[in-house]
C-alpha cells in the first residue's frame, strides 16, 4: 500500500524513492510487525483473561503442565494481525506470491480459530472434528496449489530443486500440485505438534522465516540465482517482506510467550504459521531445504508417527510421551532446558539449510 503512495509522491519528493528498496522495506517490516505485536500483546492478554479463554491441559500430560491450565490462549490472533497489517502496508500488493501466502495464513488461521474456539469457549477438549480440520486444510492447500501451478506451469516455478546437485532440477508437471499439497498441510500440522512448550514453536518459526527471507532474496535476484545455481523466479524477492513480517510478529509474540508464558498462540497461530512457511518454501522451490531448516518440526512429527506406529504394531511405546519434547520433560529435564536446546538445534539446522545453497 505504501509503495503505491511512494510512487505517486516520488516526482515531488525524492525521499519516497527509499520505499522502492527491498532492503529498506524488509527492515521496516520487521519493526512494524514487532511494534504491532508488542502493542497488541498486553491488551489481548487482558481481553482473553476477561473472556476466560484459557488453555485446556490434558490430564495425561506431564504434571508440570497443570499449572498452565487457564493461561490465555488464541494469542496467535495477534501474530496474524501483525503479519497481515505489515504485509498490506509494506509489500507490493500487485505480487501474486504475496497474496498466496496471505491466503494460506488467514485460511489456516480461520481453521485454527474454530478449533480453538470449540476447545476453550465451548469446552470441547477435542476441538474441531479431525476429519473436518483436515478437510479444510486440504481444500485451502489444493486451491492454492492449483492456482500456483496455473500461474507458473512449465517454468522454473514448477521445477524440483534437489540440494547438493546443481543441475538436477526436473520439471514436476502435475506432481507439483501433489508436492505443494503435502508441503503446506504437513508443515502446518508439524508446527502445531511442536507448539507444546513456552516459546518452543515460535522461535524455530522465526528462525526458519529469517532463513527463507535470505533465500527469497537470492531466488528473486537473477545474478545471485545464477551464482548459486538455483532457479531464478521473478518477483519472488517480494516474499522477503512477508518473511520479515513473520520474524517481527514472532519476536513480538515471544516477548509474552517466553517461559513462563503469559499467552499461548493456540491452533489459530500454529496452523497458520506452519502453512505460511510451507507456502513460502514451495514458492521459492526449496521444499528440501524446509525439511532441513525446519528439522525441529520434522523431529516432533516423526516422534508422533513412530510412537503411534510402534504402539499399534508392537504394543510398545518408543518414547515416554510424544511429541518428543514431552519425552525429555518426563526424563526430568526442566522445561526451559528443553526449549533452549531445541532453539539451538534450530539455529544450527537453519545455517545448514542455507549452506546447502552454496554446496553444489
Swiss-Prot record:
Topology in membrane: Multi-pass membrane protein
Enzyme Commission (EC) number: 2.7.8.13
UniProt subcellular location: Cell inner membrane
Record keywords, A-Z: Cell cycle, Cell division, Cell inner membrane, Cell membrane, Cell shape, Cell wall biogenesis/degradation, Magnesium, Membrane, Metal-binding, Peptidoglycan synthesis, Transferase, Transmembrane, Transmembrane helix
PROSITE patterns in the record: MRAY_1, MRAY_2
Major localization class: membrane
Family as reported in the entry's similarity comment: Belongs to the glycosyltransferase 4 family. MraY subfamily.
Name of protein: Phospho-N-acetylmuramoyl-pentapeptide-transferase
